[in-house]
Amino acid sequence: MGSLPLFLKYILVFLVSMVPIVELRGAIPIAEGLGLNIFLYYPIAIIGNMLPVPIIYLFARKVLEWGKDKKLIGKFFTWCLEKGEKGGKKLKESAGIRGIFFALLIFVGIPLPGTGAWTGTLAASFLNIDFKTSIFAITLGVLLAGIIMSLGSKIVAILGWFGVFAIIAIILVAILVSIIIKKKKHAIK
């Protein structure tokens, strides 16, 4: 990919950031690997990741409901519907109605598999969260995920394998702390 013209590298970042599941979580490390300028690739990845969001919010649920009974696409559409419903239920359980904005922001903003703008938007539409509120929370979440991925990619680029292990250690500690906090909350109830 080193022989690609510079503008095509940025177009690649833009296109990858629009792909479900991969989103900017995949686009930013690619941009870093291609040696692109963070001040250019970051906004390009954000825009690419956000471009499908209004369309997903307004139409995806309807299209998925329509297609779930179709022979060729039914299984995939059903899987997408179940993922959206599951994501919506998780958000509602963890946040309640009042904290749904911040729950949606964090859900999209923490770069874990299956928690990006696509899933967050689908969950927001299943929960019937107001369009403007959803778009605002998802935008902030995408910005947060972009910052986290950019920092992580820079750390790996600078520190190599040590950076990879450092990031893995940080993630494992965060998961462990989360588990401990949940257990303490359940013990109090």
Model-derived segments and their meaning:
Residues 28-29, 57-61, 121, 125, ...:
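Transmembrane alpha-helix boundary and packing residues in multipass membrane permease domains
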Residues 15, 43, 47, 136-144:
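Hydrophobic residues within alpha-helical transmembrane segments
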Residues 53, 145-150:
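Hydrophobic transmembrane alpha-helices of multi-pass small-molecule transporters
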Residues 17-18, 49-50, 109-113, 142:
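Residue-level hotspots within the lipid-embedded alpha helices of multi-pass solute transporters
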Residues 18-21, 93-98, 139-146:
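Short hydrophobic alpha-helical membrane-embedded segments
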Residues 18-30, 111-122:
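Transmembrane helix boundary and interhelical junction motifs in multipass membrane proteins
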Residues 1-13, 34-108, 156-189:
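Membrane-interfacial helix-loop-helix
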